[in-house]
Curated annotation (Swiss-Prot):
The keyword Cytoplasm applies. This is Thiazole synthase. GO terms for biological process: thiamine diphosphate biosynthetic process. Keywords: Cytoplasm, Schiff base, Thiamine biosynthesis, Transferase.
Amino acid sequence: MLNLYGREFSSRLMLGTAQYPSPAILRDAICKSGTEIITVSLRRESAGGKQGGQFWQFLQELDITILPNTAGCYTVKEAVTTAYLARDLFKTSWIKLEIIGNADTLQPNVFSLIEAAKILNSEGFHIFAYTTDDLIVAEKLLDVGCRVIMPWCAPIGSAKGPHHIDGLRSIRAYLPDVTLIVDAGIGRPSHAAVAMELGYDAVLLNTAVAKAGDPILMAEAFSKAIQAGRMGYKAGILEARNVAVPSTPVIGKAVF
């Protein structure tokens, strides 16, 4: 079971809700994926008018755990304010904290992230910290009270998959008891499987499903890939070797 701030979930797939062709496809993709947690941007929800209200009603009808996020924030003040608004609107202390440092790469501003995390942790928030694959940053986030760290796999929406596996592997090795969720940059089900094979606890993705030719089928594919990756990790994956090793025993081999 996946344990997040004292709550247990059977699915290790978390799904974003943006960019889907229609609400109906989003709903069906969520159902097919088996996810129990979806992320929602407060900026989308509070975009105003009738559309925002309809989306909020749609979310309530899903009867699923909502993880609001601070997507689109560039400063500590923006992120903290957004977190407070999200807590009031969604009635949850959970917040996926993300602060962008560069408009082109969408790379997290880890310095502002740590500062905002310290503030929000002191105010009783349960933070899911979206960060880079830097071990030291992850440790600093733990120091200020975060219990769930979300290293990126690659830049948001890039679909490149794990581009720095050694970084992800290092975080997992040095933080064996911390809940780690790979977030951003996932493009294929195989990417998600790799993350799970590294020992990560879950995967959060959005674009790879939302922009797929068949989002519903892709949601199912990711669900199965994550399950397979987790099973492989638990079973004990064979380490790669630089030399060949025969798999067929030579005892009893005929000699001519």
